[in-house]
């Protein structure tokens, strides 16, 4: 029977699934199939014409992915979701469903390095430009919106600045201009720490590779449509949702799909044509991660806060950045929006500058030095020399990256062991 609970802990286990009708399997099966049998020619025609819901081809939809999509949509308070092959593919398809050559997006400069590079280098090759705003002040973002802007973009917890945007004010200025707010909520832990849609976001993306999967075993992403943006009211800015579509014999998406016009366009146009779909085997691993997400996030944020407070008092540490600390620039907004903890990632710099910070990273034993976050294990990296290496020095500063910055994605090991590892590294470096 359908789950009616609003509790995150229950939804992460049950939303989007009923036991398999044919086998009564309690676990979500892996549907390793490319395609699905039509009852007859007319049935196949109705499916291809989007006149009837159902499965056609696994590049667009898959029963295993369908459970994951419904579960994430429930956890994020969205109306629909699309599973993708990675977080980057989720972001790329989420944006290119909205924007075409000649359009732009307005974005904070506080971004993950891969996203910054996508916006700066790859999207311009398609004729889509980005207006970068230094910081995330709502008025500064609003000032950059013009008639060709298709989205305002921020991260729920910036990587690696850990700024927390004022979602409600940013949504207000974006909506006043008829523009949707898109939020990457990867650092929000699948909606456990914050649900941007509750605060005005229209589209949410995730790298499900991170805390959703939680074990460093597979790559995946997801796009969530709030179902709240009025595409019909803003038809001049978004004609593709409001005019006859040449690929579907003149179908008008807002008339056929109403508030889910964006989600259907993303699936039946962008996902179909780009091919960034999620693999059912990978989705199965993501579903395993989802089942313990709240439990892991509790330990992640508990450990991160404890490590941040330890490092803040350490005589060999120059500075610490973590939203839970009163010294952090976003502490007040973090208290407002992050109701289940201040995040699972922190940064710090060692006294002695960049060379000393690099020595500390190299001296760590328990923590793994690699390019990922959200694993159950503690992970570290020096972003200036890795994830943000492609940025110029000026761009690194605008993204919140300094040469001495050590990023720590705090795991769920015993906190005494985590602290002991950093203590010995700071001592021997």
From Swiss-Prot:
Recount how this protein's activity depends on pH. Optimum pH is 8.
Q: At the top level of its lineage, which domain of life is listed?
A: Eukaryota
- Pathway of action: Amino-acid biosynthesis; L-methionine biosynthesis via de novo pathway; L-homocysteine from O-acetyl-L-homoserine
Which Pfam families does this one have? Cys_Met_Meta_PP
Task: Supply the enzyme class, top level.
Answer: transferase
Q: State the needed cofactors, names only.
A: pyridoxal 5'-phosphate
Q: Which UniProt keywords apply?
A: Amino-acid biosynthesis, Cytoplasm, Methionine biosynthesis, Nucleus, Pyridoxal phosphate, Transferase
Instruction: Please state, per the UniProt record, what induces or represses the expression of this protein.
Output: Repressed by cysteine.
Its protein name is Homocysteine synthase
